[in-house]
Amino acid sequence: MPRGLELLIAQTILQGFDAQYGRFLEVTSGAQQRFEQADWHAVQQAMKSRIHLYDHHVGLVVEQLRCITDGKSTDADFLLRVKEHYTRLLPDYPRFEIAESFFNSVYCRLFDHRSLTPERLFIFSSQPERRFRTIPRPLAKDFFPDHGWEPLLMRILSDLPLRLPWQNKSRDIRYIIAHLTETLGEDALPRCHVQVANELFYRNKAAWLVGKLTTPDGTLPFLLPIHRTDEGELFVDTCLTTTAEASIVFGFARSYFMVYAPLLAALVEWLREILPGKTTAELYMAIGCQKHAKTESYREYLCYLAESDEKFIEAPGIRGMVMLVFTLPGFDRVFKIIKDKFAPQKEMSAAHVRACYQLVKEHDRVGRMADTQEFENFVLDKRQIDPALMALLRQEVPEKITDLGEHIVIRHLYIERRMVPLNIWLEQVEGQQLRDAIEEYGNAIRQLAAANIFPGDMLFKNFGVTRHGRVVFYDYDEICYMTEVNFRDIPPARYPEDELASEPWYSVSPGDVFPEEFRHWLCADPRIGPLFEEMHADLFRADYWRALQTRIKEGHVEDVYAYRRRQRFSVRYGAISSTANSS
């Protein structure tokens, strides 16, 4: 190879990343217009397009590099010099951390995910931890109640870049003050102030104002979801001021925010204070940088592994028919491998399962489907694998394992947030907790269906419970669009003997679903059945599902709230609006 080629390749990779991130910002910058125009289908399409940008640009760079090297193979020393040159480009580069992930992706694409060593890749960052750079403008603006909270909030709402009129700004300000007074107390409120991010966070049908509320006792989140009416007027739907509420808003089961952030690292650092329970990976994931989030997730895994003497074990719960799932006992994630052979009743291919996981990645997850990271050639130390799990791996996924002596390499797997399987949770809880779990399960089904997702297999074992008590779906092999399903009523029996027969007395075609049958496995437990009938009996009616299909086909996009209905201002303070004047 000619001398100097290493630098050219390093520069080409970095320029390719610049192009990718420029397009990322371009798509993101359209979020305000899509919100103002209520173009909700464009919102969904932009979300998918932005996810695809990264892999598309990695592919473009790989093709450029093959042209530059004339398709010739490169030796290890050459690649090390490329990385050295690339590293030298990063100290003055503002998005160094994502640029390192982009380099990793290009390398993996070129070498088919082989030889993934710290010498060749940025397994850990080459730059100082949490490195800051001079930024062209502050990320946020401070507001102090020098003349009271009403003028303070008026300034905040009036400073927003949104160009739509307000339905009733004064009313919304009173709602916010009422909430803050209830939360903090009337005496503490004058001693508090707010710092608000300059950019709005857009997702689904809302524009989120994200801020920090500084109180005498510490800093709290200050989140205002701003919606628009069908008439094009703005209103604040609620105010959220606890870290638990903020954690749910930025949760792993939700779509990525669109927030214009030329310097994502600075924004991540700013968010840490109000999201103390979120890891670096989760913060990057929440704001749409999912590929770098994968890098950070892998780093978090390596750090945990280095400090733990735990062994990998099969994950608790009912063993799956499609996926083999394992975990570390104290780690908050699980590892999922597609089995080489499925149970007979699972008539599908591994390619179909991977397509289902990709569908979830690109779709609006409405807070009810767990996000995943996909890995290839994942290395495990045999000494850290429990013998029972090793035997299971050899039995269920031998075609996906390469034995390297002291290590094994798993050809393909997913990493996903660990939750308590819902069936186990239901066995352990009673009273109000049981009631809440059944309510959550039904709400999860409804919200998925409204987002055009039919889970397929609705058994409790396919759902998990998060640390906040939310029910989330995580078994995707039978997932499909609602519009692909034929929801049918079971025809009346012709004779009494029909109901006792082993075969149905009516025809069943592929895609047919009979909601009446859900009752048999969802209500079998006498503790659960009455609760389900009380709260979710309509899920057993085919006409309920057909009505949802009609709304979807008509183009209706449902509202998705990252908080309970009872937290909405219209529910809490509805009476106030009758005397409020529009502004």
Curated annotation (Swiss-Prot):
Pfam families for the chain: AceK_kinase (PF06315), AceK_regulatory (PF20423)
Positions of the catalytic residues: 371
Catalytic activities: L-seryl-[isocitrate dehydrogenase] + ATP = O-phospho-L-seryl-[isocitrate dehydrogenase] + ADP + H(+)
Annotated compartments: Cytoplasm
Record-level Gene Ontology MF annotations: [isocitrate dehydrogenase (NADP+)] kinase activity; AMP binding; ATP binding; phosphoprotein phosphatase activity; protein serine/threonine kinase activity
Source superkingdom: Bacteria
Binding site for ATP: 315-321, 336
Assigned GO CC terms: cytoplasm
E.C. numbers: 2.7.11.5, 3.1.3.-
Keyword tags: ATP-binding, Cytoplasm, Glyoxylate bypass, Hydrolase, Kinase, Nucleotide-binding, Protein phosphatase, Serine/threonine-protein kinase, Transferase, Tricarboxylic acid cycle
Protein family: Belongs to the AceK family.
Official protein name in the record: Isocitrate dehydrogenase kinase/phosphatase
Lineage, broadest ranks: Bacteria, Pseudomonadati, Pseudomonadota, Gammaproteobacteria, Enterobacterales
